Amino acid sequence: MIPGEIIAAAGEIELNAGLETVSIEVANSGDRPVQVGSHYHFAETNPGLIFDRDAARGKRLDIPAGTAVRFEPGQTRQVTLIPLSGKREVFGFRQQVMGKL
């Protein structure tokens, strides 16, 4: 084994298995790209992104940790969201929640 090496189990690894998902359509109405990270509270993303923010409350992107989705200007795309886990408390971001969901 090499220091820092990760040896994964054989076969497919399913991320976020068993979590409830919701798909929403997101459009970038701005003139600049917007990138959203894997653990960002999606309802609080850039106001230039147009989507159902109520449906996104308490959710994050269903993508691998440490990755992001980029929305180019004028682009519309579907994304899949999953619930935030743990204590389900949100602090920071755009300061729209600042506590329990």
Swiss-Prot record:
UniProt GO cellular component terms: urease complex
Assembly, per entry: Heterotrimer of UreA (gamma), UreB (beta) and UreC (alpha) subunits. Three heterotrimers associate to form the active enzyme.
Catalytic activity: urea + 2 H2O + H(+) = hydrogencarbonate + 2 NH4(+)
Pathway: Nitrogen metabolism; urea degradation; CO(2) and NH(3) from urea (urease route): step 1/1
Molecular function as annotated in GO: urease activity
Protein name from the UniProt record: Urease subunit beta
Membrane-spanning parts: none
Coiled-coil positions: none
Classification via Pfam families: Urease_beta
Class of enzymatic activity (EC top level): hydrolase
Family as reported in the entry's similarity comment: Belongs to the urease beta subunit family.
Principal location listed in the UniProt entry: cytoplasm
Cell compartments where the protein resides: Cytoplasm
Signal peptide: none
Domain of life: Bacteria
E.C. number: 3.5.1.5
A GO BP annotation: urea catabolic process
Swiss-Prot/TrEMBL keywords: Cytoplasm, Hydrolase
